[in-house]
């Protein structure tokens, strides 16, 4: 089985796949909309980096209703963006960018979401992108960073990985399917400990970061530029 690719085939099954694979994914998406309602600055831009089929983009849009914010949805998969576009009416205040998130030029942004996206970048590229995002965010704005993490304590890692595998079995995946997906993602999704992510955020210039969600080995952080 080859490496995992976000192609047309994956785009067609993505909502089902991610909800069966990521615990509380829909809750995370909904809460990102809530966070946007709290922290997006009126009249600014909100970026969803690695937007896939746009669930997070739409949650941000809903959370910023009446604030004159524009949501900029970025993905490097044309298949993903095309399917997202087909589900959105023209009047909705969403701009689509087919681009590598490392190449995005951020403008007037106060809210950025990296919802299970950073983990697909090479390790050496992550601090550079976080620094670029920090420097572009308006004071008072924030970054939401969701990641599948690993753990410094091997026993803790085994605990969470085992529970995650059981979660997928409960959602209809066979042990063979779980093993095949793990193999496909092995060289594509590169996990880091939560502490490393928080260290990267601090080094990028974010004044503070908090864990607002965790289920098994899935974590979401919010980092502020004060």
Which stretches of residues belong to each language-model region?
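Conserved alpha-helix/loop element of class I SAM-dependent methyltransferases that forms part
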Residues: 24-42
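Class I SAM-dependent methyltransferase Rossmann-like catalytic core
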Residues: 1-4, 8-28
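A conserved beta-strand element that flanks and buttresses the S-adenosyl-L-methionine
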Residues: 113
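Core SAM-dependent methyltransferase catalytic element
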Residues: 204-226
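Class I SAM-dependent methyltransferase SAM/SAH-binding core
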Residues: 47, 52-103
């Amino acid at each position: 089985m080859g490496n995992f690719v976000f192609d047309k085939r994956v785009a067609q099954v993505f909502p089902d796949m991610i909800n069966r694979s990521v615990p509380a994914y829909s809750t995370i998406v909904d809460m990102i909309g809530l966070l946007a309602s709290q922290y997006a600055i009126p009249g600014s831009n909100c970026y969803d980096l690695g937007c896939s089929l746009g669930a997070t983009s739409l949650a941000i849009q809903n959370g910023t209703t009446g604030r004159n914010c524009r949501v900029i949805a970025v993905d490097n998969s044309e298949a993903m963006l095309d399917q997202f576009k087909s589900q959105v009416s023209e009047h909705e205040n969403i701009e689509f960018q087919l681009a590598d998130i490392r190449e995005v030029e951020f403008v007037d942004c106060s809210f950025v979401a990296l919802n299970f996206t950073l983990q697909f970048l090479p390790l050496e590229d992550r601090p550079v992108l976080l620094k670029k995002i920090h420097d572009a965010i308006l004071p008072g704005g924030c970054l939401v960073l969701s990641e599948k993490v690993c753990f410094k304590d091997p026993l803790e890692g085994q605990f969470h990985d085992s529970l995650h595998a059981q979660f997928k079995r409960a959602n209809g995946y066979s042990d063979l399917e779980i093993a095949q997906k793990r193999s496909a993602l092995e060289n594509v999704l590169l996990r880091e400990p939560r502490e490393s992510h928080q260290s990267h955020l601090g080094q990028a210039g974010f004044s503070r970061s908090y864990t607002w969600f965790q289920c098994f080995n899935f974590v979401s952080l919010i980092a502020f530029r004060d």
